Design a protein with these regions (language model features):
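Conserved small/polar residues in nucleotide/adenosyl-binding loops
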Residues: 125-132, 136
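Alpha-helical transmembrane segments in multi-pass membrane proteins
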Residues: 4, 8, 12, 17, ...
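Membrane-interface alpha-helices at helix entry/exit sites of multi-pass transporters
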Residues: 42-45, 49-59, 85, 120-124
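Transmembrane helix interruption/hinge and helix-loop junction motifs
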Residues: 78-80, 118-127
Length: 136
């Protein structure tokens, strides 16, 4: 068995298990974000419960978490994109199903965006630009 797949999967999952929404809720308002609003441990619920500023902070941290999992895998296994994909997908799964929160996490959208940005940021930049132009 090639242990590189396992290493990528475990590191990606552990990156994903870091729940920024939970820690921001505890540190800033001393609340468990899963007990307020939509009861979802994600950036959208933080925005509803704690305000736009903290929602943006959580979203950025979740995006960075998805990107960091991919970047670490690309650093450990240069030129082997399959390990980066595995790390990114497992980071999303870790965000949705974190083991230390009884497998109740967020929806994984910001982590998915972070994974896409790390894998091919030029393509994502163009997509976001087109989306912004079509809205205004």
């Amino acid at each position: 068995m090639d242990y590189n797949y396992l290493i990528s999967a475990i590191t990606g999952y552990l990156f994903g298990c870091f729940q920024a929404s939970y820690f921001v809720g505890i540190l800033v308002n001393k609340i468990d974000i899963r007990e307020h609003g939509s009861t979802n441990a994600g950036a959208s619920n933080v925005t509803m419960v704690m305000g736009f500023k903290w929602g943006v902070v959580v979203a950025v941290l979740d995006i960075l978490k998805g990107s960091a999992a991919v970047w670490l895998s690309q650093f450990l296994f240069p030129g082997q994109i399959e390990f980066a994909f595995i790390a990114g997908i497992c980071a999303i799964l870790g965000h949705i199903y974190p083991f230390f929160m009884k497998f109740q996490g967020g929806k994984g959208i910001a982590t998915l965006i972070g994974m896409f940005l790390a894998l091919n940021w030029r393509s994502e930049e163009r997509r976001v630009g087109k989306e912004c132009r079509s809205r205004w």
